[in-house]
Curated annotation (Swiss-Prot):
<comment type="function">
    <text>Part of a cell division machinery.</text>
</comment>
<dbReference type="InterPro" id="IPR053492">
    <property type="entry name" value="Cell_Div_Machinery_Comp"/>
</dbReference>
<protein>
    <recommendedName>
        <fullName>Cell division protein B2</fullName>
    </recommendedName>
</protein>
<dbReference type="GO" id="GO:0051301">
    <property type="term" value="P:cell division"/>
</dbReference>
<keyword id="KW-0132">Cell division</keyword>
<keyword id="KW-0131">Cell cycle</keyword>
Amino acid sequence: MADVNDFLRNWGGRQEPTISEKIKNLFKSQQPLRYRLVMANYRLRTTISRLDVYISKLQERDRSLFEKVVESQISKDSARAAMYANEIAEIRKITKQLLTTEIALEQVQLRLETITEIGDIFTSLVPVIGVIRELRNVMKGVMPELSIELADLEEGLQEVVLEAGEFTGARVDFATSSPEARKILDEASAVAEQRMKEKFPSLPSFATSVDQKTNANQK
């Protein structure tokens, strides 16, 4: 097990490594742990900003289709109203997934900021990795490029934990999602549900009933 001085050097990157450490580090990332956490946080902010833009575009698309539903109702074109309502339902399903991801990543970002300040890697970073892994899987079918970004971020944070483990002798199981990770995701989903109600108006009852009848006939 490495000593405290080794950990401090790897955390802040201030001291010169020994010859043997230089050889060993040829196979590792050369940035100190703290620097890598700062960069991970920067990447998270960029991802969150992209999600926000994408959600805004979906909201605008939803608004446009909602107006067409109303227009179709006025003209008594129930088939067209149902078509627009179906598309709105799909847009809102995707939007809720993106909102949940955005909110959860905001929580992850806050956690990373705290970890960067206090250096509490094992008790705080492992649940974060679990959250990112779950979100990566969800995003595969929605935004594949975002899923790839999250996979890279997850891998980088796992390396931080594993390297920190060399100094503490601690072991971690990345395959098992922690209760805290599940709690973060559940809370994000609940907040996303509430925001959906605030951001998106309910479909007119006529369009909703037509939509349900259309789906029933398709079964």
